[in-house]
Amino acid sequence: QHASYLDQIDRDAWNPSDYATQLTRRARGLPFWFSLAVHGTDKYRAAVEHTLSIARDVAAGIEAMPHLELVKHPELSVLLFRRRGWNTADYQAWSQAAALDGSILCVPTTWRGQTVLRLAFTNPDTESRRVLDVLDAMR
């Protein structure tokens, strides 16, 4: 069998889709590569550094709130915290309500056998103050 539609058209030009692990799967690295090619590594570096800064700012804000406890300091842009006095059902209900009203996507997870909340920052346009305002309203 020969599938001519799979042949490389231009063998002299580098094409990232030729490096997919299987021809039946899309080249998952292509969107990232394209974004790097368009925006450049300096903008990516700045965006990543900004999300790390957001995570640190939010962690510091959580530590200042008496009703919250920072469980795990940020690793890259992910942190864990708990609301003092809440149980698993409380976390589930709050998380669902917050997602439905569009205020925040903050989902429960389990850390060392305890239900906690997880925040992962990936959007450099996220504003620390808005996140902290939502968390402050958990009182």
Residues covered by each model-derived region:
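A generic structural motif
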Residues: 38-42, 85, 123-127
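Generic non-transmembrane alpha-helical segments
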Residues: 57, 61-65, 93-104, 137
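Conserved PLP-binding catalytic core of the aspartate aminotransferase-like
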Residues: 69-98
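PLP-dependent enzyme catalytic core of the Aspartate aminotransferase-like
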Residues: 111-139
